[in-house]
């Protein structure tokens, strides 16, 4: 079990690193969206490539941060019932959901998206829009994002089984302290203090 927990912690570190880098793409998406709107309104000009880059980045945020979101226990769930249960009952529900819903769904998405990406890459497919971008980078995000989610699902499964076996702490409890938004604000403050 200790070996699996070490693997789980490495997966956690990977998704934490990816999440901390990728959530800065939100700022880039906002700036690009604002820039596109300003250029379109002031200069009556538009670029399909810039519009497509906007959805590439937006897709990257959601797909690449799916594992990080699972790590932080921030995915949408129905807490009305589960929140009233004991920690062990919650862990059992998570184990069941991971084994019978999350992992099969992720496996199907990886299985379907990998050939979709490969075909696009091998055929050098580009967008049908005039001035559009190549499609394979956006399509590569799908299997990578679901692979990160699968890895994190495995990590969460290991941590919950360890908790149920009495060999690890409650993995849900550690995420109740700070929301992701609070941590982002704290990180921005630390960066600002470091520059002054």
Predicted regions and their residues:
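Alpha-helical transmembrane segments and membrane-interface helix-loop junctions
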Residues: 1-196
């Amino acid at each position: 079990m200790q070996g699996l927990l070490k693997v789980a912690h490495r997966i956690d570190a990977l998704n934490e690193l990816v999440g901390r880098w990728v959530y800065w793409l939100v700022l880039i998406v906002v700036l690009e969206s604002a820039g596109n709107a300003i250029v379109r309104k002031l200069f009556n000009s538009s670029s399909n490539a810039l519009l497509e880059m906007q959805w590439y980045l937006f897709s990257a945020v959601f797909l690449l941060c799916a594992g990080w979101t699972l790590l932080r226990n921030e995915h949408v769930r129905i807490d009305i019932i589960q929140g009233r249960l004991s920690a062990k009952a919650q862990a059992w529900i998570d184990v069941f959901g991971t084994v019978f819903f999350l992992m099969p769904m992720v496996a199907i998405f990886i299985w379907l998206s990998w050939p979709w990406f490969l075909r696009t890459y091998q055929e050098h497919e580009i967008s049908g829009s005039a001035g559009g971008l190549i499609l394979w980078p956006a399509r590569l995000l799908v299997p990578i994002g679901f692979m990160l989610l699968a890895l994190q699902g495995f990590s969460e499964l290991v941590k919950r089984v360890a908790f149920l076996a009495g060999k690890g702490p409650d993995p849900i409890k550690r995420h109740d302290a700070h929301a992701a938004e609070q941590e982002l604000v704290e990180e921005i403050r630390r960066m600002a203090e470091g520059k002054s």
